[in-house]
């Protein structure tokens, strides 16, 4: 069966037709100014036109009318350096991954440009309110609690909601990571999709056979939210080896959106981690890059363990920063008053999460799930997953700061 044309295909065809028309116009008109002005808008007009085949109703062809990016469906085996969609630093998906368009790792962009700088504190306060930290400060606390109730998953939802029969969450997250990295999707997509899965499972019973469908549709929803040129529902059906049909993927998408009440933009670990990393950045670019790679590696590892659901995303981000700094400089205290001010946390506030992240890094938990570790063993990521960390953290590093010098 021929694949339906998408708008991206139509845009390419329209561009080629416009170029041919321009050449003919130039041949017949030496000045060519008027002809060029007329055909300049042709690609956009043709691409956006309503008469494109299969670009109509979603009920007949899900996603056929949306701009789509169909990665190679052969399997998630992309090597760093392989061709992929270009990701410009500072775009919606964050810094691009190594290998996207062949480029190197890009430092976390400045999240507080001149236009944003006056509002940095307000933005930070709003993000923390969304994660549930400052609900009591809301003017209408009752309404706020009702609206934000579903943004935080239940800590022990496996026992309380699922009856203990879902013990495959770690494997599901590991598989989702393989897809996101293998098909060069935005890194934000993984964090959002995992949060959708946890929130959905906190209040909806899902049997084990449909768990992969939930993860697949969560990736579909997150890719729509993050990426204008997202893969189609057909693509997400195919990556399950057609275990689930396109209609099943779309139906589960509708269930997720209905449950979330279309509140899809909750802050995740990477949201806060990028802000912390930029604010803590020094003048040595290679050191900055290595620290960022280490912290982002730890942040992805944190998704594997359901124990970390109990922590707010900003706490997990702060703990990843602590463990990342400790790993790269084990003899230097990772926390100081400046970092404490930037993150808003004392060491005692994040100690439990620090130990959890450190256990994951050391392989004391979930060492059998290799997707994330293998990804960061690559030279493109400076092999940060192979950098050893001391087995224990010095007790003095886990004490709260009392003086400027610790």
From Swiss-Prot:
<dbReference type="GO" id="GO:0051301">
    <property type="term" value="P:cell division"/>
</dbReference>
<dbReference type="InterPro" id="IPR036915">
    <property type="entry name" value="Cyclin-like_sf"/>
</dbReference>
<dbReference type="Pfam" id="PF00134">
    <property type="entry name" value="Cyclin_N"/>
</dbReference>
<dbReference type="GO" id="GO:0005634">
    <property type="term" value="C:nucleus"/>
</dbReference>
<feature type="region of interest" description="Disordered">
    <location>
        <begin position="1"/>
        <end position="107"/>
    </location>
</feature>
<dbReference type="GO" id="GO:0016538">
    <property type="term" value="F:cyclin-dependent protein serine/threonine kinase regulator activity"/>
</dbReference>
<dbReference type="InterPro" id="IPR013763">
    <property type="entry name" value="Cyclin-like_dom"/>
</dbReference>
<dbReference type="GO" id="GO:0000082">
    <property type="term" value="P:G1/S transition of mitotic cell cycle"/>
</dbReference>
<dbReference type="InterPro" id="IPR039361">
    <property type="entry name" value="Cyclin"/>
</dbReference>
<comment type="similarity">
    <text>Belongs to the cyclin family. Cyclin F subfamily.</text>
</comment>
<keyword id="KW-0195">Cyclin</keyword>
<dbReference type="GO" id="GO:0000307">
    <property type="term" value="C:cyclin-dependent protein kinase holoenzyme complex"/>
</dbReference>
<dbReference type="GO" id="GO:0005737">
    <property type="term" value="C:cytoplasm"/>
</dbReference>
<dbReference type="InterPro" id="IPR048258">
    <property type="entry name" value="Cyclins_cyclin-box"/>
</dbReference>
<feature type="compositionally biased region" description="Low complexity">
    <location>
        <begin position="29"/>
        <end position="57"/>
    </location>
</feature>
<keyword id="KW-0131">Cell cycle</keyword>
<dbReference type="InterPro" id="IPR046965">
    <property type="entry name" value="Cyclin_A/B-like"/>
</dbReference>
<dbReference type="InterPro" id="IPR006671">
    <property type="entry name" value="Cyclin_N"/>
</dbReference>
<keyword id="KW-0132">Cell division</keyword>
<dbReference type="Pfam" id="PF02984">
    <property type="entry name" value="Cyclin_C"/>
</dbReference>
<protein>
    <recommendedName>
        <fullName>Putative cyclin-F3-2</fullName>
    </recommendedName>
</protein>
<feature type="compositionally biased region" description="Low complexity">
    <location>
        <begin position="11"/>
        <end position="21"/>
    </location>
</feature>
<dbReference type="InterPro" id="IPR004367">
    <property type="entry name" value="Cyclin_C-dom"/>
</dbReference>
């Amino acid at each position: 069966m021929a694949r339906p044309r998408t708008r991206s295909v139509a845009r390419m065809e329209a561009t080629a037709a416009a170029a041919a028309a321009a050449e003919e116009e130039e041949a017949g008109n030496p000045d060519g100014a008027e002809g060029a002005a007329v055909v300049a808008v042709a690609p956009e007009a043709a691409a956006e036109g309503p008469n494109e085949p299969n670009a109509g109703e979603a009920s007949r062809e899900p996603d056929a009318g949306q701009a789509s990016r169909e990665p190679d469906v052969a399997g998630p085996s992309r090597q760093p350096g392989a061709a992929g969609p270009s990701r410009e630093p500072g775009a919606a998906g964050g810094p691009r991954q190594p290998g996207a368009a062949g480029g190197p790792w890009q430092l976390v962009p400045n999240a507080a440009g001149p236009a944003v700088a006056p509002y940095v504190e307000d933005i930070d306060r709003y993000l923390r309110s969304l994660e549930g930290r400052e609900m009591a400060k809301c003017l209408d606390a009752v309404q706020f609690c009702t609206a934000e109730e579903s943004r935080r998953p239940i800590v022990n939802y496996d026992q309380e909601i699922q009856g203990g029969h879902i013990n495959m969450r770690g494997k599901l997250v590991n598989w989702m990571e393989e897809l996101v990295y293998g098909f060069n999707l935005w890194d934000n997509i993984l964090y959002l999709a995992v949060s959708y899965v946890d929130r959905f499972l906190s209040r909806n019973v899902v049997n084990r056979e449909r768990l992969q469908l939930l993860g697949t549709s969560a990736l579909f929803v997150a890719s729509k939210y993050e990426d204008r040129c997202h893969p189609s529902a057909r693509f997400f059906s195919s990556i399950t080896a057609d275990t689930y049909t396109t209609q099943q993927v779309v139906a589960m998408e509708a269930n997720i959106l209905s449950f979330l009440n279309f509140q899809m933009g909750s802050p995740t670990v990477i949201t806060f981690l990028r802000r912390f990393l930029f604010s803590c950045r020094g003048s040595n670019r290679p050191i900055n890059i290595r620290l960022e790679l280490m912290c982002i590696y730890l942040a992805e590892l944190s998704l594997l363990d359901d124990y970390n659901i109990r922590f707010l995303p900003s706490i997990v981000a702060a703990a990843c920063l602590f463990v990342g700094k400790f790993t790269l400089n084990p003899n230097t205290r990772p926390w100081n008053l400046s970092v404490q001010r930037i993150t808003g946390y004392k060491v005692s506030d994040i100690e439990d999460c620090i130990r959890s992240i450190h256990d994951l890094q050391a392989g004391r938990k979930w060492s059998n799930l290799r997707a994330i570790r293998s990804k960061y063993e690559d030279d493109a990521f400076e092999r940060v997953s192979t950098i050893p960390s001391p087995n224990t953290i010095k007790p003095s590093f886990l004490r709260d700061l009392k003086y400027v010098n610790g």
